[in-house]
């Protein structure tokens, strides 16, 4: 009987590990077993660990899925990362894992992703919680700012990816000041 339990446990563990072995552009840490799911999406360059305190409070009542996006905090980078791909892949994750109407909680860039997912896939999402998401910082300081949705950000991406770790940290500190 003990051997059967051990085999069943190993099979379930293996299956649960395969669930998150998909080709998503983010890592997922699952905790809690509540009926309602919450998906936590961190901000730019942040680890999902920024949600640790919140998850510690909610995991007794909710099933928590904490994402860390590709290229941040030890998650392998993508060759061509994009907001659009991340949005579509998070929606795919919700569908494939059969997560019913999760609460999406996003900070900064994660807030933008949360809004985009809820707008495009309202049938997939329950409630949304947005923490400090600013859609366009330039619009705050330039009164006649006009949106240009087809901006080519290649130069900016090249400059950021060419930075060493210290330069990147310094840039983050300057933007937070």
Language model region names:
Residues 2-39, 59-62, 96, 100, ...:
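Alpha/beta-hydrolase fold catalytic core
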Residues 119, 127-165:
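Flexible "cap/lid" loop of the alpha/beta hydrolase fold
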Residues 65-105, 109, 120:
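Active-site loop/oxyanion-hole signature of alpha/beta-hydrolase fold enzymes
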Residues 166-177:
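Alpha/beta-hydrolase
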Residues 111-122, 128:
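Short glycine-enriched nucleophile-adjacent loop
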Residues 30-76:
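Conserved HGGG/HGGXW glycine-rich cap/lid loop of the alpha/beta-hydrolase fold
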Residues 46, 71, 111, 135-136:
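Active-site micro-motifs of SAM-dependent methyltransferase domains
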Residues 27, 50-53, 57, 85-93, ...:
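Alpha-helical elements of Rossmann-like donor-binding domains used by nucleotide-donor carbohydrate transfer enzymes
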